[in-house]
């Protein structure tokens, strides 16, 4: 058992902050992240992959871009992304958002694609040229830094 306010976080700068609950070794079958997004911050870049992912908004408002269409997500809204579904989540509204993200692992990076999406580009969450390489997709972003939990990232208990 761990307390999210006491474990290692990563500050990704313009892509928000997240806690993955893992130490030096990744969980082999399931990835789970607690993401904190300010308005306008994407959780990552618009993509599709061979694994399913699920997202639950715990606080705030987000913009979901799925298959090129924009939809609002509010507190307690859940989004299931089947394999090969193009998607990204962006913080929206006037306050920070907290999103729990869960995804299956074990299939490697095969099938990961960052396609071009006008909707995602409009929100700073897309690539200008399709790629299958995360290093190319995220090349213009600052390197992620290890961080301690910052007071106010998560809702009060």
Protein language model annotation of sequence segments:
Residues 1-29, 118-157:
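A short, N-terminal "cap"/entry segment at the start of jelly-roll beta-barrel domains
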Residues 14-20, 33-49, 83:
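Conserved short histidine dyad/triad with adjacent acidic residue
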Residues 28-33, 51-53, 60, 83-85, ...:
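A generic structural signal for short beta-strands and their flanking turns/coil linkers
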Residues 34-39, 47-65, 102-105:
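Short, conserved beta-strand element in jelly-roll/cupin
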Residues 54, 68-84:
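Short acidic-glycine-tyrosine-enriched beta hairpin
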Residues 63, 75, 83-109:
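Ligand-binding loop in jelly-roll beta-barrel domains
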Residues 107-113, 123:
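A short beta-to-alpha transition loop/helix N-cap that caps and shapes the active-site region
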């Amino acid at each position: 058992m761990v307390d999210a306010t006491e474990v290692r976080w990563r500050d990704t700068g313009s892509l928000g902050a997240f806690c993955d609950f893992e130490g030096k070794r990744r969980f082999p079958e399931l990835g789970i992240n607690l993401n904190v997004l300010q308005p306008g911050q994407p959780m990552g870049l618009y993509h599709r992959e061979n694994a399913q992912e699920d997202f639950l908004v715990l606080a705030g408002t987000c913009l979901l871009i799925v298959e090129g269409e924009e939809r609002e997500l509010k507190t307690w809204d859940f989004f299931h992304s089947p394999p090969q579904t193009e998607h990204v989540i962006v913080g929206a509204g006037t306050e920070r958002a907290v999103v729990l993200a869960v995804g299956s692992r074990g299939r490697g990076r095969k099938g990961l694609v960052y396609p071009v999406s006008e909707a995602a580009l409009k929100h700073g969450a897309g690539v200008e040229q399709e790629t299958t390489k995360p290093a190319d997709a995220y090349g213009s972003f600052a390197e992620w830094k290890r961080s301690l939990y910052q007071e106010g990232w998560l809702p009060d208990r």
